[in-house]
Amino acid sequence: MPDPLLPLLPSPQDADRPWLVCYGIDERVELTGHVLSMWLAKIAGFVTSESTPGDGVHVGLPPHWRSVAWACGTWLAGRSVLLGSSTHIHAAGLLPELSVAFAPESLVEEAEAQALVPPASLALRWPGELPALVLDGAADLMHYPDRFTPVSTTADSVCLRDLAAEGAAPAAPGTTAATVPSGERPTTLTRAQLVARVETAGASTGAGNRSASRAVLVRSPDTAQMLQEVLVAWRAGRTAVVLTPEADDDVAAAAIRQEGITA
């Protein structure tokens, strides 16, 4: 069975519209599908070059355009994404092949490779000196090609392990964020299961409604929930407008107004 996840991801041909917009405090970043696909390709190249397949790539990042890029780039490389803190990782007895985070203390020290990513949306390198043996999760990506041939994997391959599954916060009033279907949220999903959940969430929220606005607000403190909502938006041909955890109600209102989000 072919990989059902890859068709949801942007490709170099998707240059006609923004796929992802990220709002933070005094920050707005817009990425077309073409530009985003280049980031995914570089990340996939980095992942496959710097690590060998293990228990997964630890993406220790909060909701942000970079966490979307690292998760999707990991999937492009045929690997699984691990979400949660180093404590969660240790408790589960897992050994990531790569750990990526915004802060040194959030890295999993036992990972085969580690990379620090600058939290500033437009930064192209880590600000300051890197700890010993830790890679720059922005500058070091620039050495990799803008295109990447997806690593062949199957629909039943695990793609997401959410070790911090504690239930996602409800969507903000006035948004069309796709929520996780009722019931306890699973901590492990195959590629087929993730796509099925995206399809179910999209159907339950009317994400493909032709009268809906071209963009959808994604506001969740939970990275796993944020990733699902982004995929729901993309599957419906809409722009995912992600708010970072620091973005307050004023930023949300500005994003809704500027991006023309209505429903």
Predicted regions, residues:
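Actinobacteria-biased recognition of intrinsically disordered, low-complexity terminal regions
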Residues: 1-17, 27, 49, 206-212, ...
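AMP-dependent adenylate-forming
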Residues: 8-31, 147-189
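ANL superfamily AMP-binding
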Residues: 17, 34-59, 76-79, 88-89, ...
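Conserved AMP-binding
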Residues: 61-64, 218-223, 240
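Conserved short alpha-helical elements in the N-terminal third of ANL/AMP-binding
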Residues: 73-77, 224-240
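Short hydrophobic alpha-helical runs that function as membrane-insertion/retention elements
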Residues: 81-84, 115, 240-243
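Conserved ATP-dependent adenylate/AMP-binding module captured primarily in the ANL superfamily
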Residues: 82-110, 122-135, 197-215, 246-263
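Preference for solvent-exposed, low-hydrophobicity sequence contexts
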Residues: 114-167, 178, 188, 250-251, ...
